[in-house]
Amino acid sequence: MIFMVKGALIKFSSYEDSINKLLTLLKVSNELKKYDKIILKPYIADTNNYTPVEFLESVLKFCIANKNPVAEVFIAEGSDSSDTTDLFESIGYNSLTEKYSIGLLDLNNTEVEEITDSEFLKFSSIKYPKILLESCVISLPVLMEHSETEIVDSLSNMLGAYPSQHYSGFFSSNKNKIRKWPMKYSIHDILICKLPNFAVIDASKQGHIIAGLPIEIDKTAAKLLGKDWRSIQHLKLAHDSFSSRLIKKQENEDPKIKITE
């Protein structure tokens, strides 16, 4: 097992064993107990490219076993170009809701809150799923290369939070309105609305599972694909932006020491 500053990477043995060890080590249960809603956000492109059911189920079982007694758990995604509920059925996610009595949410058709933020780089405002704002959001991508976002990681996975009812074109089910500029900006602005609380990346094809805080573990994920994270446009932009936000926050929160003679 390899430790990172804000996460860890473990050699893949099986989904259940690797994920249990990793999440226990990182004491994720302590964070889960703070929330009344937990959202598992898998990646679904189509019926050939998606977060595996076995991977999702292992994270789900850990969350159910370690959540506070009243907390609800949901699986949520907003597919781009396809009907999300049909994909849930085709992939097999529906079986998890029946087995564990949890909810499935289509983020393309859910209640939204309009968010404005001076740190948005392209959008003037974003209609963001309200339930994500109220929940512990865990991003669960499967690591792979991607033609639009270069790689699929915990950050780019959050493109699913753009509801298609507000971001698709008139004659298309694709979320065309997030493609008016380079994708790195749409990823950045959706993360300004809310950065996932935590992420677990299925890098089993590369021999590992990675877990920890988004941005930091995505850098490790990029390395597993033989890439320098600085070359991944959305990851470099997020690193620079959120580092700057953290510095500003610390400057505002740190007590000022006044020296008198």
Residue ranges and their predicted role:
Residues 2-39, 45-78, 82-261:
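Extended, low-polarity segments enriched in aliphatic/aromatic residues
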